[in-house]
Amino acid sequence: MLASSSRIRAAWTRALLLPLLLAGPVGCLSRQELFPFGPGQGDLELEDGDDFVSPALELSGALRFYDRSDIDAVYVTTNGIIATSEPPAKESHPGLFPPTFGAVAPFLADLDTTDGLGKVYYREDLSPSITQRAAECVHRGFPEISFQPSSAVVVTWESVAPYQGPSRDPDQKGKRNTFQAVLASSDSSSYAIFLYPEDGLQFHTTFSKKENNQVPAVVAFSQGSVGFLWKSNGAYNIFANDRESVENLAKSSNSGQQGVWVFEIGSPATTNGVVPADVILGTEDGAEYDDEDEDYDLATTRLGLEDVGTTPFSYKALRRGGADTYSVPSVLSPRRAATERPLGPPTERTRSFQLAVETFHQQHPQVIDVDEVEETGVVFSYNTDSRQTCANNRHQCSVHAECRDYATGFCCSCVAGYTGNGRQCVAEGSPQRVNGKVKGRIFVGSSQVPIVFENTDLHSYVVMNHGRSYTAISTIPETVGYSLLPLAPVGGIIGWMFAVEQDGFKNGFSITGGEFTRQAEVTFVGHPGNLVIKQRFSGIDEHGHLTIDTELEGRVPQIPFGSSVHIEPYTELYHYSTSVITSSSTREYTVTEPERDGASPSRIYTYQWRQTITFQECVHDDSRPALPSTQQLSVDSVFVLYNQEEKILRYALSNSIGPVREGSPDALQNPCYIGTHGCDTNAACRPGPRTQFTCECSIGFRGDGRTCYDIDECSEQPSVCGSHTICNNHPGTFRCECVEGYQFSDEGTCVAVVDQRPINYCETGLHNCDIPQRAQCIYTGGSSYTCSCLPGFSGDGQACQDVDECQPSRCHPDAFCYNTPGSFTCQCKPGYQGDGFRCVPGEVEKTRCQHEREHILGAAGATDPQRPIPPGLFVPECDAHGHYAPTQCHGSTGYCWCVDRDGREVEGTRTRPGMTPPCLSTVAPPIHQGPAVPTAVIPLPPGTHLLFAQTGKIERLPLEGNTMRKTEAKAFLHVPAKVIIGLAFDCVDKMVYWTDITEPSIGRASLHGGEPTTIIRQDLGSPEGIAVDHLGRNIFWTDSNLDRIEVAKLDGTQRRVLFETDLVNPRGIVTDSVRGNLYWTDWNRDNPKIETSYMDGTNRRILVQDDLGLPNGLTFDAFSSQLCWVDAGTNRAECLNPSQPSRRKALEGLQYPFAVTSYGKNLYFTDWKMNSVVALDLAISKETDAFQPHKQTRLYGITTALSQCPQGHNYCSVNNGGCTHLCLATPGSRTCRCPDNTLGVDCIEQK
């Protein structure tokens, strides 16, 4: 659809061709002419990878953008965007423009720096040399303005590669792009400068994860979503989005210097759109061109405008001072007036170097159909769409509906036994469930501080044949909970949807199918302000539940804590017109305050209510009975309650819909209408004459109507689903699933999957989970995966929000609480000392780490914590208690390493950039003052349990088969002031053994109860892994500080060093007691390996050496003879049979596994990022469950406390193998060894 006015054609063609005709001798922009960048300039460096987002870059002054003047931080992404707010992970790749966040996009494409060759640098620069150069660029593009910036954000994408995707386009192999964006700001305005060196853009398209093909890069700006509650797209401007225009970025300009593009992005002139510079390349000031005599043929020159509707927009000649302004009138197409956002495929593009400006104003979008625009300004519009019929639209109807064609289109209608609008149908009389989210920003009483809550769950249950709805909204703060009690209509809308229908009248679901938008305004009489309620119903989801999103904003009167609210039955008139329903009423409610001095004062209050409901109605069926213009909703048995302990708000109402009546709604009405029929909850009530009625079981149930039973269609009709299927019965219905290796065809039958290899989207990164810092992608087999938010975040896994742990006031009153992504910290206020959970008057003495940190920063003149650390300078990190953080990293090089409690580097722990070593803290957290925690063991009940360590305690998690009984998890043992690392279990004496790296020591405790005991506390460095030989009655452990492996009897006596050479960071250790083998891991960064030997130390050899990263945990399953390990470097779990050393990958894509144990078909491992115990099913190679303890700290060792020992014996099982001291089993024999500290007169060594 092109505007063909000859005048517009001539002007635009001339504007697009001028840069070609007038190109002068201006030279190309070289890489050396970019703004200085790199570590030497103090730049920060974005993490290598795909789809990464930087932390917030705090700005010294505000950035202005469109109509905003308060942007104090920006975010830099891998994909060529500078964002004015943190981008959601699902929008971090191309294909979603305009995004919901504010964006400056000099080259929006799917870029990749995983190989480490490409880099993204960014900084804010206040130096005069940089700000002056930015000012010169702006003056060149806008010579008439006076602009002197005080700061500049400089972002450089250097040698970044295109994301290739599975297709691996050979044309893009080895190609890399370099470009730069500078955002310069003064007190009154901001400008963007884009720089593209002549050889900087070697590719112009990238593979789209969303579209599965190559898409062009985009040069654009977007205001992002606007509005607090009801979001809508703000203004946005696109300057290049096809291959030809992107190719010419380095060849042309709008500022007079080739490869340099300047835009005014924040000032009073940019409220509705970004203003580009318009200095034509190669022209001289004062040049004039005749606009009247030239004409061009559009057959050879094509316009570069997208067919997207806006309000009338003036296109000026692309030179300052142009006299002619050409306005394209906009014609609104009624058929598409409610489109959510500007739509329409791009028209053919211009071949000119000049980029056409496309502006999209913040407004309700309009899509415009324009056929011809003549010189007279008359616009002719037409609709070329053919009539829609059931033949190609049957899928728009419910499976329980029929589709019928009419003269102007098609309509859907539910079949007998179902109710709805045809697009959505549910069984008559069947209970319904509604799920959704609630967010709000509410001022209570006269408070000037709003109560804000987000992502709050709403659940509703509806007994349809009674018209009664029960709605619960969880985690509502008590500061606002009681004050929301009068707002029963928040849940009342659900009651209207499923109100009992009287003959000839329809409830909300019959009219809308549960797909509509509702906005209501509540005005409280005698109180200032009002409350706006916005709700969007999105129909039935894949689980058969209706979905709703609710947003509340405004002010409500304060209701005292502990009050009750009573609402009398009421009626409300609903007025209907095409696709719109309105109602208004005045309601009273009684507030009874808590009893004081023997009296409970009550007062009656009033509010006025207005609401509008909009929905999509099928208008093609002229024969359908007209809906009454007015219907009366009768509501009684209104119940409202706020549970202060559970923080749950509850509403319950009974609803019926019918004609306008005066007096009691119950008078002389049929029991079906007033809910006194007594039918089963899975039955429909059929009214008869006067007060007669019958009960009829809903479809999928059978019975007499007063009692209904579910029909098991799968048992009664074994072939109902067809071949290669599994039938699953559900209440009132059934579902069919294809067996493994089959998938549903378009005809609904299961057909074999042909030549389709499953894709692990978690491994390839093509999933839609939130960023790894907030969520994890869990591979579930085949091509399936699930998304789960990490601890400290909430959401559906695709979008995770930080949980504000400071909200419940967890810190001491004399401490500050700092909420951080996924966690929080407490810090005592000045003049107090403590850990933040307990603060007492006094100044705390600084630790060695804090002194060293202050000394280094002071010597470098970098004492301002808001400024970045100077490049090349290493500054140690201290933990919350002032001790050296166990993991230290160099900010410039990216290398990380472990340190001991004195800050000294631990040999063999240094990792390359992008990998973090699994360092252990050697300092226990301080003990909080308060009631003493008993250290006695809490006896375990019978059965098999998982035992895992969490800093200063050991917890138990019962197993039922392979299922974790998470609700029964409890503490087994508290050992304050210790950091327990390794765990092992003796199935004979039912004793658990552990290593502690703080004292250091090795201890044990009985599962039957009693006090724990320390069995070894001398000559230890950093004991980590520990293993038990339950047949030989020995323990083995690794020591990563002394670099050795030792053995001793179970009581800690008779110690002997087995190995003290060729060990760097030994950690996990396990025994194969029956065969007399020992296995251990060494995560030496230079040479990670898994080794084995006999238990006597002979026959030592490397078992696994290739393709290891950070092998942490190790487990041996005596029942299957399988050795498995978890690797925090490769993020894999792997297994092998030591007698047949062919490895197999159990699962990839783990987060940060630490320790592992086995039981049955499962591995169970602790994960540092998830702070969870994760179950991995080896049979299907996927994570099946996860347990997250209430206390969110790191989990360490894990072991299985078996209810009985595995069968088998070795040569040390009986009479200690005839040895005087240590009996150490070997395959088919044993070796008698003496302890290191025993002279030979009473000890005999023999084989």
Curated annotation (Swiss-Prot):
LDL-receptor class B repeats: 990-1032, 1033-1075, 1076-1120, 1121-1162
Residue ranges constituting the NIDO domain according to the UniProt record: 106-268
BP terms from Gene Ontology: basement membrane organization; cell-matrix adhesion; glomerular basement membrane development; positive regulation of cell adhesion; positive regulation of cell-substrate adhesion; positive regulation of integrin-mediated signaling pathway; positive regulation of muscle cell differentiation; regulation of basement membrane organization
Residue stretches making up the Thyroglobulin type-1 domain: 846-919
GO molecular function, one term: extracellular matrix structural constituent
Residue span(s) of domain Nidogen G2 beta-barrel: 430-667
Gene3D superfamilies: Green fluorescent protein (2.40.155.10), Laminin (2.10.25.10), Thyroglobulin type-1 (4.10.800.10), TolB, C-terminal domain (2.120.10.30)
Signal sequence annotation: 1-28
Role of this protein: Sulfated glycoprotein widely distributed in basement membranes and tightly associated with laminin. Also binds to collagen IV and perlecan. It probably has a role in cell-extracellular matrix interactions.
Protein name: Nidogen-1
Source organism per UniProt: Homo sapiens
